[in-house]
């Protein structure tokens, strides 16, 4: 469930404030499960809607969904396996290059295939998160020069998802209203 609060989408708010769920791990897992449900709903969009930019000079829904999958893959393969190993985290790919490559691929790929690949990768992420021991959720990561706990890192990724979900939802709402 998504709640709009002063224009900001907050699904972790729903779990904590409305349902009384305090565990940030449950909030993260809930977020990812809800995000999969949302992505599935995009399968019914007409192709022209899928490929139309959400705003002038912005990405299309295809490009937005398409760029999320390689980042999930990165977290599954280049972040989570290094928890508790003491090894340095691998460098992140160049964000602009990865985003542009994935956006191009999404523009030229089948809509259902893009969505299903995203869902498969997000499901891998969920399964990987479920395997993390309780004590590791507060472990400090050092991506680059900053330090951040795993839970804060994952909450940041969820906020990134929600930013894009909001863009897509608002674009669809405006178009449905004829704006």
Residues of each region from the PLM?
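Long, hydrophobic N-terminal alpha-helical segment
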Residues: 30-49, 54-56
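Acidic/His metal-coordination segments adjacent to aromatic residues that form catalytic metal sites
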Residues: 20-22, 99-113, 143-152
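Alpha-helix N-cap/loop-to-helix boundary motif
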Residues: 27-30, 56-57, 68, 72, ...
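Extreme N-terminal tail/first-helix region
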Residues: 2-33, 37
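Acidic/histidine-rich alpha-helical segments that form the ligand environment
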Residues: 30-34, 41, 99-138
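Structural signal for well-ordered, non-membrane alpha-helices
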Residues: 35-43, 73-80, 119-133, 162-165, ...
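Hydrophobic packing residues in well-ordered alpha-helices of helical domains and bundles
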Residues: 24, 28-32, 80, 111-118, ...
